[in-house]
Design a protein with these regions (language model features):
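Well-ordered, non-membrane alpha-helical segments in soluble/globular domains
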Residues: 5-10, 35-39, 71-80, 105-108, ...
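Flexible glycine/acidic-rich beta-alpha junction loops that bind and position SAM and/or redox cofactors
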Residues: 99-102, 120-151, 158-172, 183, ...
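Core AdoMet radical
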Residues: 1-4, 13-35, 43-76, 90-99, ...
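Catalytic cores of alpha/beta
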Residues: 99-115
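Class I S-adenosyl-L-methionine
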Residues: 79-82, 113
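Radical SAM enzyme core and accessory elements
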Residues: 151-226
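Betabetaalpha-Me/HNH-type nuclease active-site subdomain
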Residues: 85
Length: 226
């Protein structure tokens, strides 16, 4: 967050307007303080507030998808917010489903239950056949199998706080994948270009997506076959 954010928040409080202001963040939650000013000391002074914290997977997978994420620091920051939250909608998880993130479905579900917070869920945009990190890049049968395995684990113990994840997964099974959206050679060539682009990005970042995908042999075999 920019310096001006912290100054503005303090100024609103100093002028006595905080009780008239609703504050909402969509944030990586990588920083919760600056120069002694703490976000979760400020927020309770406002009329209402909400933090939707972006997370695409736990641990190593989450750190791969969202470059720069320190998962353990993120978790510490999120729990700091939970300590001052008075309603269930003040601290929520915002999960964007990606292809590598499908390997984290059970872990994200468990995290939501362990923290007792709502897990808002959406799917990565897929505007081009090069979007190989989209779950819709996977063959439809494999995607549905992964989803069904996750639902079998989740549904018996899910609460309303995980319902967004379950609904999104069920909807995802009925969506067109890259082969349906971009017929024939376009889908094949697009995947190859997308894979090459991701490999270049990995090289720059010093990462390797195959290390992540090796968690599921089926997904790794698909990736290798592109």
């Amino acid at each position: 967050m920019w310096d001006i954010h912290w100054k503005a928040m303090q100024r609103i409080i100093e002028l006595g307007f905080a009780k008239e202001v609703y504050v909402r963040y969509n944030t990586n939650l990588s920083r919760t303080s600056l120069k002694g000013i703490k976000l979760f000391d400020l927020l309770p002074q406002f009329q209402d507030w909400q933090v939707c914290s972006s997370l695409d997977g736990t641990g190593e997978v989450g750190e791969y998808i969202r470059d720069g994420l320190d998962y353990e620091q993120w978790l510490e920051n999120f729990k700091e917010g939970l300590a001052v939250a008075k309603t269930s909608r003040e601290m929520r998880l915002d999960y964007t489903l990606t292809m590598p993130g499908l390997l984290e479905l059970k872990n994200m579900f468990d995290l939501s239950q362990e923290l007792n917070v709502e897990l808002l869920t959406k799917v990565m945009f897929t505007f081009s056949p090069t979007e190989v990190l989209s779950p819709l890049a996977l063959p439809h049968e494999l995607l549905c199998t992964i989803i069904d395995e996750a639902l079998e684990y989740m549904e018996p113990k899910a609460t309303r706080k995980q319902q967004s994840l379950i609904d999104t997964l069920k909807n995802l099974k009925n969506r067109e994948n890259l082969d349906d959206m971009f017929l024939g050679i376009d889908a094949v060539v697009g995947r190859k270009k997308g894979k090459e682009r991701q490999q270049r990005i990995d090289k720059i970042r010093g990462q390797d997506i195959t290390k992540i995908l090796s968690r599921d042999k089926r997904v790794l075999e698909w990736w290798t076959s592109i």
